């Protein structure tokens, strides 16, 4: 039966879900079942009435509403106790504000830490940290340890929120910055709070020392327990102070503050084992007070902020368990320590690689934000000291050695040439800062943003080529032996290709591609993007060598002494080698997929509303804004990858064999790399088993089986280990 209600001044909020409560309210119920059914008869079979006010947001809300996992409002219908706020709980005597015992302090602090972590993982403050009544108004608290801790947590939340907002690398699924009008302890200074925490810490340390066992003395179990509990409170208070001091250090502009943060993180890490071992000393939540909700702890009320939540209830916040708390903090500390290392880098390319590698770990929103604000400080200088323009010039020098940036070149002091290069470098700042900021977003959002930034880099590419041409014609008049062709253009093209490659590869990590799409993704990478990347790197290497030769000749002319020639390690050689390995891995996967398709092992969808061409064009749509390299359209791809142009056309066994050779080649390249890193070892873990599997398939193993193979992406995100089922 469908009912329509006219509700007059009803204040029962989410309690309307209970039928007995509906009966008590001043509601005049009207049966509209008949009217509704008659209205529905006007619609044809399968037809839906879509009101313009009923958009996607309302549709999602309708799906989520009253689902206990998605709708936080559902908990309210299952609770029979009276929900009290902080002041009411104090009057009622259900909460202690003075003389808290050590087990009570430990239990409350641990639950607070769990709420803090849950907030950092994307839930709202109202459903997490502010379910702790002590945090609502620390002025009411008389217990010094609890008061200092509550203020410390508020300050940590406030500074973390400020950092995340400033870095602007979060989306709605990452972080919720709303404070719901709660006071964030703004009336108390950061210094005062750290001082209060230090006082409690010192007091606890005295108690720890006074209860410590003395040599030759028989130990009283009660004194030993008190010693353990005091040590547990001391560790938690000190951890709170250290974490707060670290966040304060990151707000300072001096680079020395980063070293200070690194030191403090080591102190925080040392406290974790004591916190982990003493979790058992804290009071536990009471289980019998509620149904369907997490158990209630003294000082906590999960439903206290229910009316502050938006009308479409947010998802139910599952507070993490205490056992997971220490593990999370341990990883957070490691991430913050890694963030501190970025200030040791001087080259823009190394910084970009650092951001890429850091992002691959899928770090939390706080550590991502700290990395962003450490890199580009308020004064818009890198690490607060270097101009971004200077970083771009250094990157150009180390990559292509353009003559215009060489002090020994005639263009170096030419005003017009200076204007050209300065204007170009200034135009580079925004796209490169945006690119670094993109690497601060979560992995799924990054991919979307990489597709958009290609437009900016395409414009930059066009400008680079024009500046190159202008500088080249100027240089020819004065130094005909030197060239300025494709110097700046090569550098921008290199970054363009890196973005395109990253865009395609991230689709494997995010599991966006179906198995039948793998072949054209790997083809585009191996035959096109990696081929372009290697020629770009080779061109940059040649440009460097040409500039070095000119410099050497100039040196020879000045000095009559013979210099011993040392074999110099080429700066780009490792990257060229890695690109060759990646190209071989992609080529191996492409040929594997074509062979599987020939053997009928690839399940293809029955295309009705789309086709392979539509999917292909959708996958490579962002590349249409790029002029160099020109995008490969579907018909062009089909023509280029057509096997019938070979005489005789290769069979599946030939392709499996060719694929095994590609994997073998990748293995050889990688095994010759000195000091292999994790990435090299990860690719080897894929290449080696794939060589064996391809050889088996080439020999006719399971040829008649139509069961699709399995692709295991666990050893490497972009290249799977092929498994025969």
From Swiss-Prot:
<dbReference type="GO" id="GO:0048659">
    <property type="term" value="P:smooth muscle cell proliferation"/>
</dbReference>
<comment type="subunit">
    <text>Component of the N-terminal acetyltransferase C (NatC) complex.</text>
</comment>
<feature type="region of interest" description="Disordered">
    <location>
        <begin position="548"/>
        <end position="573"/>
    </location>
</feature>
<feature type="compositionally biased region" description="Basic residues">
    <location>
        <begin position="558"/>
        <end position="571"/>
    </location>
</feature>
<keyword id="KW-0963">Cytoplasm</keyword>
<dbReference type="InterPro" id="IPR007244">
    <property type="entry name" value="Naa35/Mak10"/>
</dbReference>
<dbReference type="GO" id="GO:0043066">
    <property type="term" value="P:negative regulation of apoptotic process"/>
</dbReference>
<dbReference type="Pfam" id="PF04112">
    <property type="entry name" value="Mak10"/>
</dbReference>
<dbReference type="GO" id="GO:0005737">
    <property type="term" value="C:cytoplasm"/>
</dbReference>
<protein>
    <recommendedName>
        <fullName>N-alpha-acetyltransferase 35, NatC auxiliary subunit</fullName>
    </recommendedName>
</protein>
<dbReference type="GO" id="GO:0031417">
    <property type="term" value="C:NatC complex"/>
</dbReference>
<comment type="function">
    <text>Auxillary component of the N-terminal acetyltransferase C (NatC) complex which catalyzes acetylation of N-terminal methionine residues. N-terminal acetylation protects proteins from ubiquitination and degradation by the N-end rule pathway.</text>
</comment>
<comment type="similarity">
    <text>Belongs to the MAK10 family.</text>
</comment>
């Amino acid at each position: 039966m469908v009912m329509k209600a006219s509700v007059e001044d009803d204040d029962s909020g989410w309690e309307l879900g209970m039928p007995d409560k509906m009966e008590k309210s001043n509601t005049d119920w009207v049966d509209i079942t008949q009217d509704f059914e008659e209205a529905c008869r006007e619609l044809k079979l399968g037809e839906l009435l879509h009101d313009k006010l009923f958009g996607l947001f309302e549709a999602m809300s309708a799906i989520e509403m009253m689902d206990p996992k998605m709708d936080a409002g559902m908990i309210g219908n299952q609770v029979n106790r009276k929900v009290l706020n902080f002041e009411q709980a104090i009057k009622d005597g259900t909460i202690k504000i003075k003389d808290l015992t050590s087990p009570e302090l430990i239990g409350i602090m641990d639950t607070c830490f769990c709420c803090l972590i849950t907030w950092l993982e994307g839930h709202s403050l109202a459903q997490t940290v502010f379910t702790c009544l002590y945090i609502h108004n620390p002025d009411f608290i008389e217990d010094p340890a609890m008061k200092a801790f509550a203020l410390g947590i508020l300050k940590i939340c406030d500074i973390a929120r400020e950092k995340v907002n400033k870095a602007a690398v979060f989306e709605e699924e990452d972080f919720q910055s709303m404070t719901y009008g709660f006071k964030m302890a703004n009336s108390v200074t950061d210094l005062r709070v750290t001082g209060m925490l230090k006082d409690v810490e010192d007091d606890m340390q005295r108690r720890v020392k006074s209860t410590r066992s003395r040599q030759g003395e028989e130990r009283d179990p009660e004194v030993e327990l008190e010693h353990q509990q005091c040590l547990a409170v001391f560790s938690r208070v000190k951890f709170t102070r250290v974490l707060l001091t670290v966040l304060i250090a990151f707000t300072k502009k001096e680079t020395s503050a980063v070293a200070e943060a690194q030191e403090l993180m080591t102190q925080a890490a040392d406290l974790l084992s004591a916190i982990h071992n003493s979790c058992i000393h804290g009071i536990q939540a009471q289980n019998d007070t509620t149904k369907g909700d997490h158990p209630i702890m003294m000082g906590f009320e999960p439903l206290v902020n229910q009316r502050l939540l938006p009308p479409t209830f947010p998802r139910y916040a599952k507070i993490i368990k205490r056992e997971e708390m220490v593990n999370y903090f341990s990883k957070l500390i490691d991430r913050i320590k890694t963030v501190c290392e970025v200030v040791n880098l001087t080259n823009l390319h190394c910084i970009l690689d650092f951001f890429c590698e850091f992002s691959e770990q899928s770090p939390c929103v706080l550590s991502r934000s700290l990395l962003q604000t450490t890199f580009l400080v308020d004064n818009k200088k890198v690490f607060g000291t270097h101009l971004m323009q200077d970083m771009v010039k250094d990157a150009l020098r180390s990559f292509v050695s353009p003559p215009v940036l060489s002090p020994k070149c005639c263009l170096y002091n030419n005003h017009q040439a200076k204007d050209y290069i300065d204007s170009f470098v200034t135009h580079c700042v925004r796209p490169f800062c945006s690119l670094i900021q993109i690497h601060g977003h979560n992995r799924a959002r990054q991919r979307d943003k990489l597709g958009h930034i290609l437009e900016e880099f395409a414009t930059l590419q066009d400008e680079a080529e024009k500046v190159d041409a202008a500088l080249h014609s100027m240089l020819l008049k004065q130094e005909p032996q030197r060239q300025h062709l494709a110097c700046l253009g090569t550098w921008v093209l290199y970054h363009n290709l890196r973005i395109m490659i990253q865009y395609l590869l991230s689709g494997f990590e995010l599991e966006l591609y179906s198995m039948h799409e793998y072949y054209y993704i790997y083809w585009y990478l191996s035959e096109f993007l990696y081929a372009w990347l290697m020629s770009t790197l080779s061109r940059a290497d040649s440009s460097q060598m040409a500039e070095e030769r000119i410099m050497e000749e100039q040196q020879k002319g000045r000095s009559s002494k013979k210099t011993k020639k040392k074999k110099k390690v080429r700066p780009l050689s490792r990257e060229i080698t890695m690109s060759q390995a990646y190209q071989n891995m992609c080529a191996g996967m492409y040929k594997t997929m074509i062979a599987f398709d020939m053997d009928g092992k690839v399940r293809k969808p029955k295309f009705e509303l789309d086709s392979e061409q539509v999917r292909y064009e959708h996958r490579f749509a962002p590349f249409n804004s790029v002029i160099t390299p020109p995008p490969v359209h579907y018909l062009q791809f089909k023509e280029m990858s057509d096997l019938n142009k070979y005489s005789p056309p290769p069979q599946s066994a030939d392709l499996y064999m060719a694929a095994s050779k590609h994997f073998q080649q990748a293995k050889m390249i990688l095994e010759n790399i000195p000091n292999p890193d994790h990435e090299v070892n990860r690719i080897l873990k894929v290449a080696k088993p794939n060589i064996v599997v391809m050889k088996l398939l080439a020999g006719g193993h399971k040829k008649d089986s139509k069961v699709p193979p399995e692709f295991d992406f666990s050893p490497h995100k972009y290249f799977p280990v092929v498994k025969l089922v």
